[in-house]
Amino acid sequence: MKSNFSKFKDFIKYKKVAVVGIGVSNRPLIKFLVKLGAKVTAFDKKHREKLGSISLELEEIGVDLVLGENYLDKLDGYDVIFKTPSMRIDRPEFVKAKEAGAYITSEMEEFIKYCPAKVFGITGSDGKTTTTTLVYEMLKKEDYRTWVGGNIGTPLFANIEEMKEDHMVVLELSSFQLMTMDVSPEISLITNLSPNHLDVHKDFEEYVWAKKNIFKYQSSNNLLVLNKDDDLTNEMENEALGDVLKFSLVEKVYNGACLSNNKLTIQGKEVCDSKDIKLKGRHNIANLLAAFCMINKYVSIDSMKYVATNFSGVEHRCEFIREVNGVKYYNDSIASSPSRTLAGLNSFEKPVILIAGGYDKKIPFEPLAEGGYDKIKILILMGDTKNKIKSAFEKVISYKKCEMEIVIVNSMEEAVKVADNMAEKGDIITLSPACASFDMYPNFEIRGNEFKNIVNRL
């Protein structure tokens, strides 16, 4: 049962509230809390000079600022603390604040708790953004007033009073956001699970545990959608509290969605033929099947078919950039894990020139080498993980007795230059890093845009 937002308004008014992080996504939250009558202090590691004009903008509406290296040392005396998702709740500063009586929460927890609209929550290791966008587009096609947020779109909490019971909200949720959740969306999906974010999570078990929060607090009339082809997610049916639908690329599924004789079906009804889909790769067929399961009760077959056969993809996801001298360039900068890069490689019909490497999330690259060695013509590596990836591939190349040229570079500019020089007519060059961007770029979008800019200058 959803709580009425008036309860939150009564609760937060006059409270001493700390918001940790003054990034773009937290700024609407800070302003909204001020509007609701809270006494807000915003915390950030950056100094005033690096934050720019936002510091003055917040001070003008009465927000106090705590900035600099030791900013978390001053969390004493607050009634409520909104933490940024990637910060662990067991940090000493949060533990101390909680012991002193602070209520520690996040924007997403409070949003799901009080949102009057129907909430669709999507998580998993790969395919989250594409599936979130597909669900959003299908609901929109059916003429629902639809909002999209979480990891994509815009922060939604500040808009909660505009939302109605007959609206639809689609959220992409990360393991960081789910880690402290004690509330679940009414309709939840786990796309698949493979090791990821082990630089933040203690181990893979904790990562899986966090993902399960997307359905752990559901009620009996809620829906959980699971991937039948993924052993980990398939077994979660036993823990479900409500209804379950499954999707599969390889098995016939009667209570869910599947690919049968190249037809995409939901509950036995044909939606479209796989040859009519614009999205590349079998992994995107899986994303469509998952979306069908989520919206089956709310969207007609016609709307599903329209989106499935017209949607051409999301930026930075196997995105075609251009063809130069017979060589095709693709931007798959979103691929921040080995499994996502492998899915991208599988969408091409021939071995590619792969540009990979980046920030080390402490996840193994052996599965990428094992599954991808025969899908790569030339491997160009950069970033913190370049030697780690090189080592994983060299082991596989050695015992498979195959050949693959591996080139180490120091920048994106150099990577594209080397790829361009080594490519022959008919080749495919793809940026699919298998790693996060933080060693060289603030996010995967900026990384992808730099790659596109360099390619467009060729």
Swiss-Prot record:
Its main location: cytoplasm. ATP binds at residues 124-130. The keyword tRNA-binding does not apply. Disulfide bonds: none annotated. Its EC number is 6.3.2.9. One of its GO terms (molecular function) is ATP binding. It is found in: Cytoplasm. Pfam families: Mur_ligase_C (PF02875), Mur_ligase_M (PF08245), MurD-like_N (PF21799). Pathway: Cell wall biogenesis; peptidoglycan biosynthesis. It comes from the Bacteria. GO terms for biological process: cell division; cell wall organization; peptidoglycan biosynthetic process; regulation of cell shape. InterPro entries: Mur-like_cat_sf, Mur_ligase_C, Mur_ligase_C_dom_sf, Mur_ligase_cen, MurD. It catalyses: UDP-N-acetyl-alpha-D-muramoyl-L-alanine + D-glutamate + ATP = UDP-N-acetyl-alpha-D-muramoyl-L-alanyl-D-glutamate + ADP + phosphate + H(+). The keyword Cell division applies. Keywords: ATP-binding, Cell cycle, Cell division, Cell shape, Cell wall biogenesis/degradation, Cytoplasm, Ligase, Nucleotide-binding, Peptidoglycan synthesis. GO terms for cellular component: cytoplasm. Belongs to the MurCDEF family. Cell wall formation. Catalyzes the addition of glutamate to the nucleotide precursor UDP-N-acetylmuramoyl-L-alanine (UMA). This is UDP-N-acetylmuramoylalanine--D-glutamate ligase.
